[in-house]
Amino acid sequence: MQKIYQLFFLYLFTYSLSASETYAINSYAIGDISIKTLFENHEGFQNNYEEYQPGELLDPVLFHDIEIYVLFGIWCHDSQREVPRLLRLLNTLNIQENYIHLIGLNFSKNEPQDRGKHFQIKRTPTFVFLRNQKEVGRIIEMPEISLEADLLKILGSLD
């Protein structure tokens, strides 16, 4: 009888562990996510957004007709640092949210619409800048110099 109790408690313990792992994995944002939802559900992103002070501001005209795809992982420390910085800078420049596409990726760097594969994402975060549906540049994982300098390098050379 004691072995039955031991097996029963072992089963309950194992089941509770697997259930909590599933919940943790499923709590990540995968696919399209709004800025509001990101900040409401992931406090670290909101805190990093509030703490970041953009450097030398860029001319908002540089962003004319630019679509920005932000492919990131909630689970990624680089994403937790860089995504809020980009969003703060874009907000400071009054870039409309409909030009900003936040796409949460899983650990395999993909999501249900396969945009991780489409954009050939190897590292997160990756910021992809498109004009007329053609890629004009990207920032992978973190800026080379600074966010502002890298954006000026990418967008400043466009007509």
State the predicted function of each range.
Residues 64-74:
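Short active-site neighborhood of thiol/selenol oxidoreductases, capturing the structured segment around
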Residues 71, 97-111:
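Thiol-based oxidoreductase modules, predominantly thioredoxin-like and allied folds used
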Residues 92-96:
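Short helix-capping segments at alpha-helix termini
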Residues 1-24:
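Bacterial Sec-dependent N-terminal signal peptides
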Residues 123, 129-159:
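Non-catalytic, surface beta->alpha helical segment in thiol-disulfide oxidoreductase systems
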Residues 73-82:
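Conserved redox-active cysteine motifs that mediate thiol-disulfide chemistry
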Residues 20-63:
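N-terminal leader/targeting and pre-domain segments
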